[in-house]
Structure formats: C-alpha cells, structure tokens
C-alpha cells in the first residue's frame, strides 16, 4: 500500500527493487488492493512479479470503491461488482489467477452469502484460488464459510491493536481460517522512527489518524519508549520485537508489515530469528492498556468488524 498511496511520494523503481529483495529473502505473500493508488499498486505488483510469478503468492482485495482521482465512492459487495472488480484486478496484475482474493470491507447492504457466492464463482472459473475477508466479525465469518471455505481473515493486529484477541481469533481457529495481521508495526509508530508529525510527509494519511494526534501521540510515544527499551535488551530493533511478538501469538497468524525499502524488508525478516521468553511476553502484554486513540477516524471505525 505504502508503495503507491497514503504514505507520501511513490518511487516505483525503489519499490520494485524492494519487492524483488523480499522474494530473494524467501518472503512469498505480496498483499495489494485495487484501492491502493487507486489501481496503480496492483500494476506495480504485477510488474514486480512478472518474471518471478512462481515465487509469489499474490493477494488483492475489492469492495472499497475509489474514483481515479482518489475520491471515496463507498463500499460495494454486489455480485456484479465482484465479477467486474476481479476482471479489472487480473488485468492490472497481469496474472491469470489471483492466489487470494479478499473482500476489503463487508458491505452492510448486501448479505455476505451473496458476496461470497459471487466470489466462489470466481474460484470455479479459475480466476481465483482462495477467498478471504477483511475486518469481518465472527458471525460474518460463520455465515461466509457456510457458502464457501474462507482461507484467511485480514484484520489489524499488533502490540497496539489487540481487538482480535478473544472471539475473533477463536472463531478463525474454530473454522480453520488463517489470520493475516495488517499494520503489525502500528502504521510504523512501533518502529520508534517517528517523534512528531513533522517526521511524516505532507501527503501522509497518518497525519489525520487519531493515534498520531496531539495528546494521543505523546502518550503513544511512552509506549514506544518501552518497546525500544525491551528491544535493546534483546539486541534487536523495535520493529523486529513487534513482529516477533506477532509470531509468538501462533503459527496461524501471518503479519504483513508494509515497507518501501529493501533494507527495512531485510530488518523485518530478521524478526523470525527472535525468540521471546515468558518474561518478554509479559512485559509486552503490559503495554496494551496504555495505547491512546482509536485506530481510525469515526468513518473508518464504522467499517471494521462488519
């Protein structure tokens, strides 16, 4: 996402080099969406994997509509739109089959059975291999799997976003659904690289995110200070510690940290070598109640847990 939109200026050459470096390191899951850009991130991923398709699991999403100029156009889970969106994504990606196709947000105006039914037709047509949902509630997951197996649920999960713990993760495990954790580094905050809003580019959407605002920002800096302290004691970076915590939550949870630079991807990959003790985990668990602010503005919060 950050390679094309939301996080400041894009640099396609650097981004493609970063994707290639990720593949070199054995990273296989590449996550995109038709709204990133909008549309241009799928094209970027398509260029990056064109000569290395067998090394990549390509996941994309539909359902949040944006105009070419970036304007938000709402949520759409209607069957005819599902088919249209998939064909457009296939063309932009330049692939014959999408490995994992998500509904980006649940459409409250369309029964999930209808949306997933249309997605299942894409599997039958050979256009999609596996189906996923994003930010879906437990009851929605149960209704969805009654229509077609759901391979993955993608939802925000990190040291500073613990909402999935409890019923949501339990439901995924009960139904055999893998969990893909987006923003596992707290939109970059947990890396410790941001000390004020001035560290973010002018076009960076985080400037409007509640957790990056005013008092919330200052309180969350205290959380990051503790992450930095614990990381130093482990001999790793704060980002690696935050990812190691995700890995420690279970083998069925896959984090997808966003990166635009090869060196950051290499840093993140290093998290797989870090083992956390019970004491480490207890210290990190204590940070959750200290996080300040909602993860989205009011409009965005209405679209999660659908």
Where in this protein do the model-derived segments appear?
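Active-site beta-loop-alpha junctions enriched in small/polar residues
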Residues: 1-3, 33-35, 61-65, 103-106, ...
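Aromatic-lined glycan-binding groove of carbohydrate-active enzymes
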Residues: 164-202, 237
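Conserved, mostly hydrophobic/aromatic
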Residues: 15, 30, 45, 58, ...
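Glycine/proline-rich, positively charged
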Residues: 69-163, 167, 178
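N-terminal binding-site loop/beta-alpha segment at the start of enzyme catalytic domains
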Residues: 1-56, 60, 304-305
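Generic structural signal for well-ordered alpha-helices
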Residues: 19, 42, 46, 86-90, ...
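N-terminal small/glycine-rich loop or linker at the start of catalytic domains
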Residues: 1-7, 59-73, 97
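Terminal-tail/helix-coil boundary detector
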Residues: 174, 202-233, 248-253, 260-262, ...
């Amino acid at each position: 996402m950050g390679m094309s939109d939301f996080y400041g200026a894009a640099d396609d050459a650097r981004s493609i080099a970063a994707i290639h470096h990720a593949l070199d390191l054995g990273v296989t899951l590449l996550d995109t969406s038709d709204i990133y850009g909008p549309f241009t991130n799928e094209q970027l991923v398509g260029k990056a994997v064109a000569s290395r398709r067998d090394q990549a699991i390509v996941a994309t999403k539909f359902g949040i509509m944006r105009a070419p100029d970036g304007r938000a156009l709402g949520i759409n889970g209607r069957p005819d739109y599902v088919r249209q969106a998939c064909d457009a994504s296939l063309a932009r990606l330049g692939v014959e089959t999408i490995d994992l196709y998500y509904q980006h947000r649940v459409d409250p105006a369309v029964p999930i059975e209808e949306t997933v039914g249309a997605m299942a037709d894409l599997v039958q047509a050979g256009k999609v291999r596996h189906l996923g949902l994003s930010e879906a509630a437990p009851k929605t997951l149960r209704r969805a799997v009654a229509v077609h197996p759901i391979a993955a649920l993608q939802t925000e999960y990190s040291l500073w976003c613990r909402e999935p713990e409890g019923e949501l993760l339990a439901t995924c495990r009960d139904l055999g659904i893998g969990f893909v954790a987006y923003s596992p580094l707290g939109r970059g905050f947990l890396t410790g690289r941001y000390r004020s809003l001035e560290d973010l580019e002018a076009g960076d959407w985080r400037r409007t995110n509640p957790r990056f605002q005013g008092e919330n920002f200052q309180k969350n800096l205290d959380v990051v200070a503790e992450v930095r302290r614990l990381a130093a004691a482990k001999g790793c970076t704060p980002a690696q510690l935050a990812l190691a915590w995700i890995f420690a939550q279970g083998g069925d949870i896959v984090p997808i940290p966003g990166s635009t630079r090869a060196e950051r991807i290499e840093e993140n990959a290093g998290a797989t070598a870090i083992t956390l003790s019970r004491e480490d985990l207890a210290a990190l668990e204590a940070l959750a109640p200290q996080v300040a602010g909602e993860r989205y503005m009011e409009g965005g919060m209405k679209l999660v847990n659908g």
